[in-house]
């Protein structure tokens, strides 16, 4: 993911900063506790596509 893009992207809900999780290919909003997926190098910034970080992973 291009670092210049990361500098301008914000959470669509709170407008806060995002952190890039390279391993999981996600953009993380720590305020809303959501992880937005990155698919084929494109961040998917729809709230309904975000993973809730407060929900335990199935396993």
From Swiss-Prot:
Question: Which InterPro entries does its entry note?
Answer: Trm112-like
- Source domain of life is Bacteria
Please tell me one Gene Ontology term that the record gives under cellular component.
cytosol
Per the record, the similarity remark reads: Belongs to the UPF0434 family.
What is the name of the protein in this document?
Answer: UPF0434 protein HEAR2489
Q: Organism, per UniProt?
A: Herminiimonas arsenicoxydans
């Amino acid at each position: 993911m291009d670092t210049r893009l990361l500098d301008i992207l914000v959470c669509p809900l709170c407008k806060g900063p995002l952190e890039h999780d390279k391993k999981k290919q996600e953009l993380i909003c720590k305020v809303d506790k959501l992880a937005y997926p990155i698919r084929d190098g494109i961040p998917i910034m729809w709230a309904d596509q975000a993973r809730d970080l407060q929900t335990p992973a199935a396993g």
